[in-house]
Amino acid sequence: AQCLVGSEMCIRDRLYNIIDRVYIGHIPEVGALALTGVGVCMPLIMILSAFAALVGNGGAPRASILLGKGDSRSAEKIIGNCFTLQILISIVLTVIMLLGGKTFLLAFGASENTIEYAVSYFNIYAIGTIFVQLTLGMNMFITAQGFTKIGMYSVLIGAVINIMLDPIFIFACGLGVRGAALATILSQGCSCIWVLHFLFGKKTTLRIKKENLRLVPKVFLPCLALGASLFIMQASESVISVCFNSSLLKYGGDVAVGAMTILTSVMQFAMLPLQGLGQGAQPIMSYNYGAKNPDR
């Protein structure tokens, strides 16, 4: 059951990104170019997600293992260190993306026709980096404790709000791609509030506590080592996407890049059930590994 909830959570998470692009593609007169511009932003957004996975997917399994051993105190040190680390990484990434965003986008496949839309979308999205990092990274610690439905709600809240705000900001307010980016970061902000409210609250097994916020290398370095493999996988996917965009822009133009954006969304959506099964099974396997119960 937990694996099925994990699959549903992944599907809902990707679904609102796809709907986001559907709205952008229907912007009058400039929809195709706007969609292509936003598509060029995807490699950078994937890199941001990779950093969230580096910390979240590295720390959450270790916390589950310690819970299985009955060492909740050490598990809370991990969640506190990972929370601090996510904030610091978010600040650094935000500065880098805001200062070098246009340069990155031009290198990643934006053309003279699409750079305006790419920059308009990404500059706003970059401001909300901290929401993305904390939502994606810290939500893993909710599912790691067995609260998979709570983790699903954090995704569902963001998805519903984003779907509601997209047409308002894009069409009613006439903000175009800027409206799509604004809707995204506001929805991620709401999800972030939900995640942190739970992790700072009393209903959770592991809480974020003030005394565990100070970074301790022997606590967070093993988490980064464990999350490095997923980070490399997602970063590699970003590099592949950049190569595709550059080649398509050279030989097929902006329309080809836009078509690849749509195709990539469909391919990612098709892979989500399997990713969700793995995400749902991870807390169970980690906990039982820590409890020395391999048969279960």
Where are these regions (language model features)?
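Single conserved hydrophobic/aromatic residue that forms the stacking wall/gate
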Residues: 1-6, 11
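Short alpha-helical transmembrane segments in multi-pass integral membrane proteins
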Residues: 7, 63-130, 172-227, 285-296
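Hydrophobic faces of transmembrane alpha-helices in multi-pass small-molecule transporters and flippases
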Residues: 7-8, 122, 126, 149-156, ...
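Generic alpha-helical transmembrane segments of integral inner-membrane proteins
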Residues: 11, 15, 19, 51, ...
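Helix-terminus/linker motif at the lipid-water interface of multi-pass membrane proteins
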Residues: 15-35, 105-112, 168-174, 235-265, ...
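Small-residue-rich hydrophobic transmembrane alpha-helices
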Residues: 35-95, 132-151, 259-296
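Hydrophobic residues within alpha-helical transmembrane segments
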Residues: 41-44, 84-88, 127, 153-160, ...
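Short runs within selected transmembrane alpha-helices of multi-pass transporters and secretion channels
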Residues: 56, 125-143, 154-159, 180-195, ...
